[in-house]
């Protein structure tokens, strides 16, 4: 796996799923391929994106700044600086300085990532802030190792939280989760169907599913009534794709 592929993988792992994730993936690909060279416009676009947490925006801003060539005097962006200040906690800053000294001795991406993984996400973000604010310099490879370690820490805690929700025995939470998943699957079906004539059928299935979820929420239904809703939808989507000559088995 190439270095940039690895960086893209880690960074996208902390972005919530949805149309915005697809858009960010495209920007990252363009930046890494050298197709997008306007850092100013890129940062302005990032700053105004909804849904993303300030820290995720800060990490993306850091990655864009590392990758896109820019004039030396280009201003650092406040939204990135604020996100990478370790919540203003002096302990984070102390640890960040110690980590920075260790990173200065590293020359490889994997070496830097290994060293960084033993620190908390707050200290890692502060260390990125040091480098972003030009208070310290490391090679781009080492900076990317720091980015990936930070994303791994964040993704780990997101995964723990997600697992808690998925394995919860509370029927109301499970019911709502199934309806949310069915609704987002329906939305994805509508987007994939596009505007071709054969798409009417898939659109109809998706639309009915969304109406059904709406009705279930409006009148309040038994928690088990949503079981299988998303799987039924995905089966419909796969049947539609087969007719269109597209084979995609990996939805479940």
Swiss-Prot record:
Q: Which InterPro entries match?
A: Flu_matrix_M1, Flu_matrix_M1_C, Flu_matrix_M1_N, Flu_matrix_M1_N_sub1, Flu_matrix_M1_N_sub2, INFV_M1
S-S pairs = none
- Asked whether the keyword Transmembrane helix is assigned, the reply is no
Q: Motif (Nuclear localization signal) spans which residues?
A: 101-105
Keyword Mitochondrion assigned to the entry: answer is no
Among the entry's GO cellular component annotations, what is one?
A: membrane
**Signal sequence region:** none
What compartments host this protein? Virion membrane; Host nucleus
Its placement in the membrane is given as:
Peripheral membrane protein
**Where are the stretches annotated Membrane-binding?**
1-164
Recorded hits in Gene3D superfamilies, A to Z, give:
1.10.10.180, 1.20.91.10
Gene Ontology MF annotations: RNA binding; structural constituent of virion
User: What UniProt keywords apply to this chain's record, in alphabetical order?
Assistant: Host nucleus, Membrane, RNA-binding, Viral matrix protein, Virion
One record GO biological process: viral budding from plasma membrane
Q: What does this protein do?
A: Plays critical roles in virus replication, from virus entry and uncoating to assembly and budding of the virus particle. M1 binding to ribonucleocapsids (RNPs) in nucleus seems to inhibit viral transcription. Interaction of viral NEP with M1-RNP is thought to promote nuclear export of the complex, which is targeted to the virion assembly site at the apical plasma membrane in polarized epithelial cells. Interactions with NA and HA may bring M1, a non-raft-associated protein, into lipid rafts. Forms a continuous shell on the inner side of the lipid bilayer in virion, where it binds the RNP. Determines the virion's shape: spherical or filamentous. Clinical isolates of influenza are characterized by the presence of significant proportion of filamentous virions, whereas after multiple passage on eggs or cell culture, virions have only spherical morphology. Filamentous virions are thought to be important to infect neighboring cells, and spherical virions more suited to spread through aerosol between hosts organisms.
Q: Please report which protein family the annotation says this sequence is part of.
A: Belongs to the influenza viruses Matrix protein M1 family.
Q: What else is known?
A: South Carolina isolate has been sequenced from formalid fixed-lung tissues of a 21-year-old male which died in 1918 at Ft. Jackson, SC. Brevig Mission isolate has been sequenced from lung tissues of an Inuit woman buried in the permafrost in a gravesite near Brevig Mission, Alaska. This sample was recovered by John Hultin, retired pathologist.
* Quaternary organization: Homodimer and homomultimer. Interacts with NEP. Binds ribonucleocapsid by both interacting with genomic RNA and NP protein. May interact with HA and NA. Cannot bind NP without genomic RNA.
HAMAP family this protein is in? INFV_M1
What protein name applies here? Answer: Matrix protein 1
């Amino acid at each position: 796996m190439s270095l940039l592929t690895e960086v893209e993988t880690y960074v996208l792992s902390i972005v919530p799923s949805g149309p915005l994730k697809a858009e960010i993936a495209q920007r990252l690909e363009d930046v890494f391929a050298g197709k997008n060279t306007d850092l100013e416009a890129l940062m302005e676009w990032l700053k105004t994106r909804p849904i993303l947490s300030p820290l995720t925006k800060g990490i993306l801003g850091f990655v864009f700044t590392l990758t896109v060539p820019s004039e030396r005097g280009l201003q650092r962006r406040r939204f990135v600086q604020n996100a990478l200040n370790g919540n203003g906690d002096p302990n984070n800053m102390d640890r960040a300085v110690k980590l920075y000294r260790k990173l200065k001795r590293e020359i490889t991406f994997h070496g830097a990532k290994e060293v960084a993984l033993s620190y908390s996400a707050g200290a890692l973000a502060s260390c990125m802030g040091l480098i972003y604010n030009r208070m310290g310099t490391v090679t781009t490879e080492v900076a990317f190792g720091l980015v990936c370690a930070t994303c791994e820490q964040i993704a780990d805690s997101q995964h723990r939280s997600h697992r808690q929700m998925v394995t919860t025995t509370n029927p109301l939470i499970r019911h709502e989760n199934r309806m949310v998943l069915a609704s987002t699957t329906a939305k994805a079906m509508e987007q994939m169907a596009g505007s071709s004539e054969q798409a009417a059928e898939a659109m109809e299935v998706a639309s009915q599913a969304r109406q059904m979820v709406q009705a279930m929420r409006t009148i309040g239904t038994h928690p088990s009534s949503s079981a299988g809703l998303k799987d039924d939808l995905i089966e419909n989507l796969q049947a539609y794709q087969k007719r269109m000559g597209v084979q995609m088995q990996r939805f479940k």
